[in-house]
Amino acid sequence: MTRKLVLLRHGQSQWNLDNRFTGWVDVELTDQGCQEAVAAGKLMKDEGLQFDVAHTSVLKRAIHTLQGALKELDQDWLPVSKSWRLNERHYGGLQGLDKAETAAKHGEEQVKIWRRSYDIPPPAMDVDDPGHPCHDRRYATLDRNALPGTESLATTLVRVLPYWHDAIAPQLKAGQTVLVTAHGNSLRALYKYLNDVSNEQILELNIPTGIPLLFELDDNLQVRSFRYLGDPEAAKRAAEAVANQGKAK
């Protein structure tokens, strides 16, 4: 039996448009981002996907993308689970900074390492910073020590995997079709795990906003195939645009 999983990065956010490091900052979708959510829903509808359950983060850009896609799918009723474990990677002291200006200051290669390397985190955010997640009530029930002040992709994967094993994988094994709407780096972490991508190869992986990535898995959740829905060239161009965000102007 083939199990189907769709990974969907949220639509364009205001800080995507502004080319700023976002991380755990809770920013809105742009009008284009809202349109991308609807377009993602249409692509999934055209594919004939009938979901049983959906998962998303606790950040509104992912939540609103999921809502827009489900409305287009006419599957608004779908059970939705939200978890902080699907949040974007925490960008530490880089959050809020302009990516191009940061590249001009520190060099494009350093910014690429911070953005795309596997195990090197950006400079940490101080726990006394008002933006640290320990001051956000949505995380009030969590162990303060579990809340990051910065993350690498490696530590993001460590955060995401328990949710995969405890929540998503059992549903897939039960034969359910699952939609996960999350963020560039939490989805890169899942992609790395599912496809057994090396630490070096993951550096070059960029996930575009608003384009569903369909995985077909076997009974043991091993990947049989995966592809972006819609025009492959459009997905390629969108991924290249993501890669270019960390370059100096």
UniProtKB/Swiss-Prot annotation:
GO biological processes: gluconeogenesis; glycolytic process
GO molecular function: phosphoglycerate mutase activity
Binding site for substrate: 9-16, 22-23, 61, 88-91, 99, 115-116, 184-185
Keywords attached to this entry: Gluconeogenesis, Glycolysis, Isomerase
Domain of life: Bacteria
Coiled coil region boundaries: none
Protein name in the entry: 2,3-bisphosphoglycerate-dependent phosphoglycerate mutase
Organism: Xanthomonas oryzae pv. oryzae (strain PXO99A)
